[in-house]
Regions:
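Heptad-repeat coiled-coil alpha-helices
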Residues: 8, 35, 39-42, 73, ...
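Short, charged, amphipathic alpha-helical segments
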Residues: 13-21, 47, 51, 81-84, ...
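Long amphipathic alpha-helical coiled-coil segments
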Residues: 41-49, 74-88, 141-152, 175-181
């Protein structure tokens, strides 16, 4: 959102504040889940799996927040189409993670839908790798301002890492399918 919707510093600051607020809400939910794990006798699946899933989903939100923070602090030139594409891919991953969560109640009886969302997360992460590699090659060939190069490279690297973490959510979910289906 911070990348795709604005190249103006004041709007970036507003987006960053909104993203930071959402990240804090995510932290609260993660802590609530982890606290409940310690007091709940029966869980829908292993505590370790719930812990891994909640923590990794929180890491996705943390990655998005980290990207927005870097954009706000570094104030780079307008983000390239590659940055906007990585942002779009992260948004797609978030949608598929949400859809995957909706499948958790029934995945033991019908694992195909959950498996499909996990595969989508993997495919999107592969697309993100391609976008990132192409962008980095072009950045080092074309960018002459060393400071700008460092700022943009850090932001793009953080975006790409966030797609990796979202894929990890899919891997955790696939392990649940294997374990329980």
């Amino acid at each position: 959102m911070c990348i795709r919707d604005s190249d103006k510093p004041e709007e970036r600051a507003d987006y960053y504040k909104r993203i930071k607020d959402l990240e804090r809400e995510g932290d609260k939910l993660t802590h609530l889940i982890l606290d409940e794990l310690g007091t709940t006798f029966i869980t829908p699946f292993d505590r370790e799996d719930i812990h891994a899933l909640a923590s990794t989903m929180d890491d996705v939100i943390d990655g998005i927040n980290s990207c927005a923070k870097r954009i706000n602090i570094y104030n780079p030139r307008p983000i390239s189409d590659s940055g906007k594409e990585l942002s779009r891919l992260i948004q797609q991953e978030a949608v598929y993670i949400g859809k995957a969560m909706d499948e958790l109640e029934t995945f033991r009886q019908k694992p195909a839908a959950l498996r499909g969302y996990c595969n989508k997360l993997h495919d999107i992460e592969n697309q993100a790798d391609d976008v990132y590699e192409h962008f980095i090659t072009k950045l080092f060939e074309e960018e002459k301002d060393c400071i700008e190069l460092i700022k943009i490279k850090e932001i793009m690297h953080e975006l790409e890492k966030t797609t990796d973490v979202a894929e990890q959510v899919g891997k955790i979910l696939k392990n649940l399918i294997i374990k329980y289906a």
